[in-house]
Amino acid sequence: RNPTPNYNLALDGGYPVVIAEKGYGTVMANFAKRKAEGKGAEIISMTGGLATNQIPSASVATLITDKPAELVASLQKAGADYAKRNGGNFEISAKADGKDVKLTVTGVSAHSSEPESGVNPVARMLDFINSLDGKVALKHNHITDAARYAADNGRLDYLGNKLNVGFSDAFMGP
């Protein structure tokens, strides 16, 4: 007879037997849509990811402006500087489409059980947007509110240490 192994049940597993799977947590923060205030470009939408247990490969924000070429140049420069300061293992690009500017952060997709194997573009998009304050003229709205909240409450810390919810044990690790 073998000793009983350490295990847990993973109800979302597609396999007949799952020895263990790291869980994940979700912080749900809601920001009331509000009219943009101030001068500059306005972020009108932001996307990233299809499932809560997935680190997506890209996050896209759409901005509107009267000066798309100028905004693209500013975002490209700020994006290159931001990527260099934050590990350089992701890319930030901006492209004009009429008066719209598509801002894309490309990271590395991963399952949430192994966040260290991915590069979360949503976290980087929010942190990047927040870092633009004073460098690139952006109107403040619910999306910039969300970016500030994310920067203040976790930034790029995927282990939850800044929120005081970080956990680790010998069997599962962090």
PLM features: what roles do these ranges have?
Residues 2-174:
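Midchain, well-structured core segments that form catalytic/ion-binding scaffolds
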